[in-house]
């Protein structure tokens, strides 16, 4: 059976009367291009109440629009010679300093320009297969807009041992972020369960419904306060999707530039950087740690805030 991804989006009162194609572009612009969405509609892969719809059909509040997208086959994922910032590499793994704007692995509607495409060119076939054809070598992810360190497994044994540490929460992951507002306390722990947003499946939200949510723990430490922003160090106790971004917004200090959970603030991406990663090496069985400094855009923002 063909593997598929299905996106189910609720139509709200604010969407009343919008054309199906325009509605989908608004809701899925971060994931798919306009041309790709229009092709899905033409191919009868956009449904309302189980019936295919046309571009100019109007949506109604209370309806659910379903978008059905075939997952990429192995042949769809090509090796691409994309420059990589490799911090460390051996026979078991490599540490990549991912640039902001790079997607980690191919997904529906986005098959090229990803970290996986670059890894296929760099490592040839020396990547773990546990993640499947779409995610070879990928042990954990970073959001598209997040820069920083990410570990990649080059064989299945390394993948299992590394993934086990992430699951057991023994791997060390530290982020640095510039958040909006002056954080009151020097240190804090945010314990708030997360689940898919009930109205927007692309987003996560704090949700105390035990049937839907998963526990999430984030610890933060203030590094420097500015007039209207704060530089914080954030350590993950769990590794949920969008965890840092949702938790910081939840306590009133959204990551600057995060248009999904805060405001754009005149920035091109969320000011969030995966600064440190540490784990037990699968072969040496010794703890190793890698650190990277924030990229230029974050450094420039920090210097700008210092001058205010």
Whereabouts are the PLM-identified features?
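Conserved "cap/hinge" positions at secondary-structure junctions
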Residues: 50, 69, 246, 259, ...
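Conserved hydrophobic positions within beta-strands
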Residues: 86, 179, 220-222, 255
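RNA substrate-recognition surfaces in RNA-acting enzymes
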Residues: 255-283
